[in-house]
Amino acid sequence: MFNKKIIFVFILTFVIVMIQGCYSFTGGSAPSHLKSMTIQNVNDNSGFGNPQYREILTQTIIDLFLNDNTYEIVDLSGDARLSIVINSIREAPVSVSPGELETERKVEISCEVEFYDNVKKNVIMKKNISSYDIYQVSESQQGRDNAIRNALSQLADDVLLGVISGW
């Protein structure tokens, strides 16, 4: 009986140690040979008509990477290059009140992200991502702008996480 308890405790301890060794917050890591990165200005192919949004996304991504400190951010000739294109910014009604009046709208932004290895001359990751936020129609233009800014912020967070975790 005593030997069974010792064996059980040993097996349980072994399993716990093995599971801990497999656990990771990021799911991967950045390639070790890449030390610096160039972040290109975001291109906006959405046709939405507000160049401010691409500038906001560009600056938010730069700020996140500077704070993260995984890569040295350089203007030219980085070991890696991050390119982002806003493909679409769409709006759609979310909820309608009695009398068929819109009460909430959804803003969805879709982007194509490419992370390129300038050292090995290959694409590390190319992915389409999207984010959205919902705003009250009664908030008019201010609500819409805030929803777009929130969606852009979430996209920037997703890009950072994707790049440093190896997507």
Where are the regions that the model predicts?
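Soluble non-cytosolic domains of exported or imported proteins
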Residues: F48-Q59, E102, K106, Q141-Q154
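A periodicity- and composition-biased signal for non-globular, repetitive helical segments
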Residues: F10-I11, T60
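A structural "domain/chain start" motif
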Residues: F2, V17-D63, D68-T70, D75-G78, ...
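Compositionally biased, intrinsically disordered linkers/stalks adjacent to structured regions
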Residues: A147-W167
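Bacterial N-terminal signal peptides that target proteins for export
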Residues: M1-F10
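Surface-exposed short loop/turn segments
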Residues: F25, N67-E72, D79-I124, N128, ...
